[in-house]
UniProtKB/Swiss-Prot annotation:
Taxonomy of the source species: Eukaryota, Metazoa, Chordata, Craniata, Vertebrata
Gene Ontology CC annotations of this record: extracellular region; immunoglobulin complex; plasma membrane
Record's keyword terms, sorted: Adaptive immunity, Cell membrane, Disulfide bond, Immunity, Immunoglobulin, Immunoglobulin domain, Membrane, Secreted, Signal
Name of the protein this chain belongs to: Immunoglobulin kappa variable 3D-7
Lineage top rank: taxon: Eukaryota
Presence of keyword Disulfide bond: yes
Residue ranges of every copy of the Ig-like domain listed in the record: 24-119
Region of interest: Framework-2: 59-73
Oligomeric form and interacting partners: Immunoglobulins are composed of two identical heavy chains and two identical light chains; disulfide-linked.
Gene Ontology biological process terms in this record: adaptive immune response; immune response
Disulfide bonds: C46-C112
Amino acid sequence: MEPWKPQHSFFFLLLLWLPDTTGEIVMTQSPATLSLSPGERATLSCRASQSVSSSYLSWYQQKPGQAPRLLIYGASTRATGIPARFSGSGSGTDFTLTISSLQPEDFAVYYCQQDYNLP
């Protein structure tokens, strides 16, 4: 077996570093699932791998067989026709979507999206 050499370690670290040079922003949502009942409060979190301007952060709702529906844009502004129970907040890397009192029609999949830096 070839003896360990320092340049091997450097090469490994370089490979780990390269993905960050693309400037790609990764959005991570949590929790993956929520088990709640009508009337309860839902809090969904979205974390960016680097700072995102609030102006470019949106939340979408999607139901089976339907296109995504814009809920929130600019991190906190409700889209037209979206009920007041939906609210968005946050800045920098941490954003939150809150549904103050869940209604039966709110049970769906929710996504956050940033348009600040697209791949």
